[in-house]
Amino acid sequence: MKNKLKILQIGSIDWSKEVVIPDNMDWYYFFSLTLRLAIKKVMEMEKINHFSAIIVDDLDLIPDLFLIESRIIPYTIFYSKKQQAIQEPIAFFLKRYCAQQIDLSDRPNLLRKLSKALFRGQYGDKMTPLDMVVSPGFKGRICHNGYENLELEGNFGSDFRPIVSWKYNIVASKKNPVEIWLEYEKDLSCELRLRIYNIQEGSAADLVRESVFSETDMEETIVLDNDFTSFLGITLEARGFGTLKIGAFHQRLTRYQFGKFVLGGKILKDSHRQEINYFFYPGDFKPPLVVYFSGYRRAEGFEGFGMMRGLGCPFLLISDQRLDGGVFYLGSDELEEGIRRIIQEHMELLGFSERELILSGISMGTYGAAYYGADFSPRAIILCKPLANLGTIAQRGRLRLPEVFPMALDILHRHTGGKDRENVMELDNRYWKKFKKADFSRTIFGLAYMKEEDYDPTAYEDLVQYLYPTETQLMSNGLSGRHNDDSTMVINWFMNYHRIILEKEFGRKK
């Protein structure tokens, strides 16, 4: 088998002598502290650039890894949760490479999971409310709220019965199991459960397995881990009466407890089942911390990893995949406070101050960077293709920008509950009310804007009008084109701003 996973184990007992190693793994075992050079030599002889996973069952042997430190990828070191690092060099090493504490007692199950979780890349997508089919037997009120949700109100019956199904099946591979998450809100007077049918691969109707998941099961992401490949047919069942709002159905390749989308990836959830994804990469553990907010994207997961890693410093990727491709990082007080807390916690992890913080984004990401940048006093905020007036964007979509960004109306309704002029102004003011309370007197702003901007034509002028009278340092550059034009040049300017600030403010030279 080509491209096998390279697994390094350091400990007192060679696991490969006691358990069956999965076929897609090459196993390398070392024990003696005198073999530090041997690990490096084996990597050179077998042309191993890095190990897919490093399993350590004795933390005293961690110094064995110091010689290959430059070859270690964060989040790939796994050690027993029963052990605590006592020596400072070892504790810092584990922190520096984001080592994961796990249960090593069930070795066969751990290796089985790792064999499926250590794949390259990432994958996730969603089925929107537009992909739902309401059961013909339901006689209550039905309201389609665009990409936001499907709203049902009425009597669902005293027994569970199918209420909604999805038009498309999901592929569940035995090599890469999926995990699922359903957005919904409901009255307490009704109850839900999810029924999933595993349809035999190559068949149209042969059932291999049928599973039912209660609301309690759905409080966490459901991992569908089968040792066979099948297609998943999904039905939502309900009983009781009241109002039910069903949002997107998310499915992603699982990494079990080792991360979301990528090793170390995490998801912030609020009580409304809304999600924000985030991923921290430690870089060289030296200032600054760059927080990058993803742009609007239908594919789920993280963007910008390559760009940010090239800077060398620690960074935090934050992405929003609600509705069709994001709702600009706004949400409940609980969700927004969660985003602020995530940024603060990672500054504390690194021992950085607000003056060692940069927030940045492109397009939709500029909203998150400025909105949450207002909660700190960052060294810099970098915005390319800035968007600020979300209500105005939705209003323009009716006549001036039809079929270009129709989801803006769903975003307007999601955040204000309406689509009238008052709602437009309310959403616009939500940004500026917070922005104008912030102290940016010590913050550098880097702006790259489109001269023929068609989404939010006044965003750049509005930002400059506010920032000009303050003591803010401002760098800006205009590019010819509309909002979605010349992305290559915009990204070049985006990265140039980062490099200028890293060199001038932090003494980092590429």
Curated annotation (Swiss-Prot):
InterPro entries xref list: AB_hydrolase_fold (IPR029058), Asp2 (IPR022267)
UniProt entry keywords in alphabetical sequence: Protein transport, Translocation, Transport
Chain segments annotated as coiled-coil in the UniProt record: none
Pfam families given in the database record: Asp2
Disruption phenotype: Loss of export of cell wall protein GspB, the protein accumulates intracellularly in protoplasts.
GO biological process: protein transport
Assembly mode: Part of the accessory SecA2/SecY2 protein translocation apparatus required to export cell wall protein GspB. Binds the Ser-rich domains (SSR1 and SSR2) of non-glycosylated GspB, binds much less to glycosylated protein.
Family: Belongs to the accessory Sec system protein Asp2 family.
NCBIfam families documented for this protein: acc_sec_asp2
Protein function: Part of the accessory SecA2/SecY2 system specifically required to export GspB, a serine-rich repeat cell wall protein encoded upstream in the same operon.
Protein name: Accessory Sec system protein Asp2
Gene: asp2
